[in-house]
Amino acid sequence: MNHQQQQQQQKAGEQQLSEPEDMEMEAGDTDDPPRITQNPVINGNVALSDGHNTAEEDMEDDTSWRSEATFQFTVERFSRLSESVLSPPCFVRNLPWKIMVMPRFYPDRPHQKSVGFFLQCNAESDSTSWSCHAQAVLKIINYRDDEKSFSRRISHLFFHKENDWGFSNFMAWSEVTDPEKGFIDDDKVTFEVFVQADAPHGVAWDSKKHTGYVGLKNQGATCYMNSLLQTLFFTNQLRKAVYMMPTEGDDSSKSVPLALQRVFYELQHSDKPVGTKKLTKSFGWETLDSFMQHDVQELCRVLLDNVENKMKGTCVEGTIPKLFRGKMVSYIQCKEVDYRSDRREDYYDIQLSIKGKKNIFESFVDYVAVEQLDGDNKYDAGEHGLQEAEKGVKFLTLPPVLHLQLMRFMYDPQTDQNIKINDRFEFPEQLPLDEFLQKTDPKDPANYILHAVLVHSGDNHGGHYVVYLNPKGDGKWCKFDDDVVSRCTKEEAIEHNYGGHDDDLSVRHCTNAYMLVYIRESKLSEVLQAVTDHDIPQQLVERLQEEKRIEAQKRKERQEAHLYMQVQIVAEDQFCGHQGNDMYDEEKVKYTVFKVLKNSSLAEFVQSLSQTMGFPQDQIRLWPMQARSNGTKRPAMLDNEADGNKTMIELSDNENPWTIFLETVDPELAASGATLPKFDKDHDVMLFLKMYDPKTRSLNYCGHIYTPISCKIRDLLPVMCDRAGFIQDTSLILYEEVKPNLTERIQDYDVSLDKALDELMDGDIIVFQKDDPENDNSELPTAKEYFRDLYHRVDVIFCDKTIPNDPGFVVTLSNRMNYFQVAKTVAQRLNTDPMLLQFFKSQGYRDGPGNPLRHNYEGTLRDLLQFFKPRQPKKLYYQQLKMKITDFENRRSFKCIWLNSQFREEEITLYPDKHGCVRDLLEECKKAVELGEKASGKLRLLEIVSYKIIGVHQEDELLECLSPATSRTFRIEEIPLDQVDIDKENEMLVTVAHFHKEVFGTFGIPFLLRIHQGEHFREVMKRIQSLLDIQEKEFEKFKFAIVMMGRHQYINEDEYEVNLKDFEPQPGNMSHPRPWLGLDHFNKAPKRSRYTYLEKAIKIHN
């Protein structure tokens, strides 16, 4: 408790339990501090449950790992105490615990002194990640009579910010120092603490050492899965069967049996907590699935179903049913006639209601209790009609392993959400169930031993899951709290998880069991049979160990990654076929990648490269790809001799990965011992050549050349003709490819290279083409225009707006295209008319269609795509129309419901004139739907809110007045023949809607019904039954009411005659809706939540 909370502290003098509080240690001591007597731990050697011998012996040798202890702290010269004092540490769960005592004053009585008494944990630790939950009793010893000692309880999660907890005003100072009270003797006061701590988190807790078992890492909101997996793991017979499943040919990332084998194997052999990500990945879960908190019963059921199906046809087929399947019979027995219905069913778990039940026996009694079917709930006995009957279930067999689901999470209709029931519910360690079996076996009584208690702390919206397990069935319990496993007492495992309110603060109200696992006593040794390494197939062991070896290798590589760099080698054959700027496309090129030590020398790398590529060192030359200031990337000179001793990271200028163009001798000449020509870095230059063909609008790579810088352009023409396969002396046009969107023509062929090319450097590119007049007829007659077109070229994904998650198709377009050019290109791909397409921008903030484009849009494609990031896929949406876009743009989209002649609703979208009226909308609807054969052919538009018709719109009403809203729906229907002409004096169309008990809970399809003044209501009922096509037996359950202003009055069906005034608004209240006829009956249609994604059933996909 902080200092503000201390202001609300209760009077210690009244000895009421004040709120526990935390307090920071107050620094400093008095000049003459009170002397402290260190008392030994009273019960340091507390009894601890057994486990594996090694763990037990270790714990006996070192009591610091114990779970509880009582220790005392005596303060001498107590009356002179002026500062806080600390006791020596007592180690529990290997954490230091100290008693802290100090003088305090009551906040509301500043002149009245009190004793502050706190328990401190691990205060001197520098770590900020540790935590430990503990319960403690703080006591001041009465030396005359221990029964009069004053004590208070605390329960707290200790962590670095709240490392002490207790009471600022534990007792009044005057009471402690009053010799008559018995708390002080010779100016000495003894303080005592009994602390009981859970295993800590965030510290070096060795679960394997202390218990013999390891935990599971918490993967997020699937933490309940850890409890289930531990429960299944300790069902040893199941574990054995899982090991025996053949998985040799299974995909390691998709096989559920293999993933389960892996988890079980690691739980059995690992010394550290085991991960479950590979298991959930094998389920085929998406991110949302993995973090949705499902019922543990649901996960248990689908997981065991999946494993059971994979076991079919193997040596362990039938293991799941053998362990978990029981049989029951559901029966219905008629009372008055000789009719009985029996249905035998298999079950794999039992769901027990706990609301209002004291213990598990009462829940079983309730489960098999006989239900009376009478009154409105009579049983339909076929030819015998509706009959009074008794309904119930009886257990035929109970399985060896009994899973009991305690229904702590239930739906609350008042709040329309699930709630958690934290009521106390008791369950025994031994559970006799013979009395619930239809037939018992004296040789094999249905006596069960508690094996697992799955516990939830928190409310319906979240919390924490743990499981208490009795691994060997011998009453020695362990607590599995995700990655931490610790010994615990039988009381902690059982009684502390009953739930309900308790004065004992060690039991938290919201912590209780939600699932129990019992094992039949006669099957205990079989179900919990020892699982040894001999039970695990050798091939499985080898596969899992190989996985571990590979993971360790990858982990080592990650740890050493900072020592290495990647060198990407690109060969000259990757330049061939490239149709863009520079020498290759970085996203398409295939590199040969080398992992190189950053501190290795260039000479060492060249030697390794030579051996790997199969070329002697004099047949290769390295040209690092260097980024130029103009945005291009070209090869640059690397001097092997001068730079041979330099390190790779130094030469790469910390570039990682480092890309190098590897020049080699022609493979055909390499065998003859040919070497690369000499290259004088001071006087020579390396140039790349490309040939452009206007007829095919393509580039052809023509290799590279070494030439002196003083060489004239004209001297290169013969080489170009030769490389391109042209006749010598063919007239050529030359360009320098400077950068994207800048290609300059070389005009003067009689000047040297350094004057002809802009800033001559190694890696410059010359593009040449034939000087042919016929090229003028080409779409892109020159290389300059080709590169300009290339610069504006863009790949656009077009997705159909009407198809959810449509992957679409890619079209290569020019940024300079206008709307019609784009539409024409896309229409050719879709084999349709450009005028029958409508396009939509992509929303910038999320992936989806935005506003539609008008057909007279004046911008270019570049304008449409300007908000996309450079490397982001460019996307536009389209929809195909049934009318030309010029006509379509003058219409509006109108979503509504169509009620067909079979009284079924379907959603349709109509496109009436945006300035039209309801009549135009109805005419459009006639074109889109199929009308009934024996109907009027006339349509009407209804407005529906909350499943009630609130109005019929007139045909001359403008559509502009009908604005859509989420709370209302428009419905179009054909007017029945009997409703075309209404005698307004004696007839009326009344709204009919469905509800169940509460008139605000309407549902189903409302409709209009014609009623006549004075007609008997039975006639109205006949028309309703005919319209809804309901069987007589079902229709008998309907009640009818007139609903006005939210209140309903039930109709006496035998006496009531229709009075039209009952369905007219009250005088003076014309603004209120008309009364309507309500049909009160049960809603058999499933209610759908607005949050349907949260109700998605859990599913294992593989």
From Swiss-Prot:
<keyword id="KW-0234">DNA repair</keyword>
<dbReference type="GO" id="GO:0006307">
    <property type="term" value="P:DNA alkylation repair"/>
</dbReference>
<dbReference type="GO" id="GO:0032991">
    <property type="term" value="C:protein-containing complex"/>
</dbReference>
<dbReference type="GO" id="GO:0005654">
    <property type="term" value="C:nucleoplasm"/>
</dbReference>
<feature type="cross-link" description="Glycyl lysine isopeptide (Lys-Gly) (interchain with G-Cter in SUMO2)">
    <location>
        <position position="882"/>
    </location>
</feature>
<feature type="region of interest" description="Interaction with ICP0/VMW110">
    <location>
        <begin position="622"/>
        <end position="801"/>
    </location>
</feature>
<dbReference type="InterPro" id="IPR050164">
    <property type="entry name" value="Peptidase_C19"/>
</dbReference>
<dbReference type="InterPro" id="IPR024729">
    <property type="entry name" value="USP7_ICP0-binding_dom"/>
</dbReference>
<dbReference type="GO" id="GO:0101005">
    <property type="term" value="F:deubiquitinase activity"/>
</dbReference>
<feature type="modified residue" description="Phosphoserine">
    <location>
        <position position="18"/>
    </location>
</feature>
<dbReference type="Pfam" id="PF00443">
    <property type="entry name" value="UCH"/>
</dbReference>
<keyword id="KW-0945">Host-virus interaction</keyword>
<dbReference type="GO" id="GO:0016567">
    <property type="term" value="P:protein ubiquitination"/>
</dbReference>
<feature type="modified residue" description="N6-acetyllysine">
    <location>
        <position position="1096"/>
    </location>
</feature>
<feature type="compositionally biased region" description="Acidic residues">
    <location>
        <begin position="19"/>
        <end position="31"/>
    </location>
</feature>
<comment type="subunit">
    <text>Monomer. Homodimer. Part of a complex with DAXX, MDM2, RASSF1 and USP7. Part of a complex with DAXX, MDM2 and USP7. Interacts with MDM2; the interaction is independent of p53/TP53. Interacts with DAXX; the interaction is direct and independent of MDM2 and p53/TP53. Component of a complex composed of KMT2E/MLL5 (isoform 3), OGT (isoform 1) and USP7; the complex stabilizes KMT2E/MLL5, preventing KMT2E/MLL5 ubiquitination and proteasomal-mediated degradation. Interacts (via MATH domain) with KMT2E/MLL5 isoform 3. Interacts with OGT isoform 1.</text>
</comment>
<dbReference type="InterPro" id="IPR001394">
    <property type="entry name" value="Peptidase_C19_UCH"/>
</dbReference>
<comment type="subunit">
    <text>(Microbial infection) Isoform 1 and isoform 2 interact with herpesvirus 1 trans-acting transcriptional protein ICP0/VMW110. Binding to ICP0/VMW110 may modulate the substrate specificity or activity of USP7 to stabilize viral proteins.</text>
</comment>
<dbReference type="GO" id="GO:1904262">
    <property type="term" value="P:negative regulation of TORC1 signaling"/>
</dbReference>
<keyword id="KW-0788">Thiol protease</keyword>
<dbReference type="GO" id="GO:0005694">
    <property type="term" value="C:chromosome"/>
</dbReference>
<keyword id="KW-0158">Chromosome</keyword>
<keyword id="KW-0378">Hydrolase</keyword>
<dbReference type="GO" id="GO:0075342">
    <property type="term" value="P:symbiont-mediated disruption of host cell PML body"/>
</dbReference>
<comment type="function">
    <text>Hydrolase that deubiquitinates target proteins such as ARMC5, FOXO4, DEPTOR, KAT5, p53/TP53, MDM2, ERCC6, DNMT1, UHRF1, PTEN, KMT2E/MLL5 and DAXX. Together with DAXX, prevents MDM2 self-ubiquitination and enhances the E3 ligase activity of MDM2 towards p53/TP53, thereby promoting p53/TP53 ubiquitination and proteasomal degradation. Deubiquitinates p53/TP53, preventing degradation of p53/TP53, and enhances p53/TP53-dependent transcription regulation, cell growth repression and apoptosis.</text>
</comment>
<feature type="active site" description="Proton acceptor">
    <location>
        <position position="464"/>
    </location>
</feature>
<dbReference type="Pfam" id="PF14533">
    <property type="entry name" value="USP7_C2"/>
</dbReference>
<dbReference type="GO" id="GO:0044027">
    <property type="term" value="P:negative regulation of gene expression via chromosomal CpG island methylation"/>
</dbReference>
<feature type="region of interest" description="Interaction with TSPYL5">
    <location>
        <begin position="1"/>
        <end position="208"/>
    </location>
</feature>
<dbReference type="GO" id="GO:0031647">
    <property type="term" value="P:regulation of protein stability"/>
</dbReference>
<feature type="domain" description="USP">
    <location>
        <begin position="214"/>
        <end position="521"/>
    </location>
</feature>
<keyword id="KW-0007">Acetylation</keyword>
<comment type="function">
    <text>(Microbial infection) Contributes to the overall stabilization and trans-activation capability of the herpesvirus 1 trans-acting transcriptional protein ICP0/VMW110 during HSV-1 infection.</text>
</comment>
<dbReference type="InterPro" id="IPR018200">
    <property type="entry name" value="USP_CS"/>
</dbReference>
<dbReference type="GO" id="GO:0005829">
    <property type="term" value="C:cytosol"/>
</dbReference>
<dbReference type="GO" id="GO:0045721">
    <property type="term" value="P:negative regulation of gluconeogenesis"/>
</dbReference>
<keyword id="KW-1268">Autism spectrum disorder</keyword>
<dbReference type="GO" id="GO:0016605">
    <property type="term" value="C:PML body"/>
</dbReference>
<dbReference type="GO" id="GO:0035520">
    <property type="term" value="P:monoubiquitinated protein deubiquitination"/>
</dbReference>
<keyword id="KW-0963">Cytoplasm</keyword>
<dbReference type="GO" id="GO:0002039">
    <property type="term" value="F:p53 binding"/>
</dbReference>
<dbReference type="GO" id="GO:0032088">
    <property type="term" value="P:negative regulation of NF-kappaB transcription factor activity"/>
</dbReference>
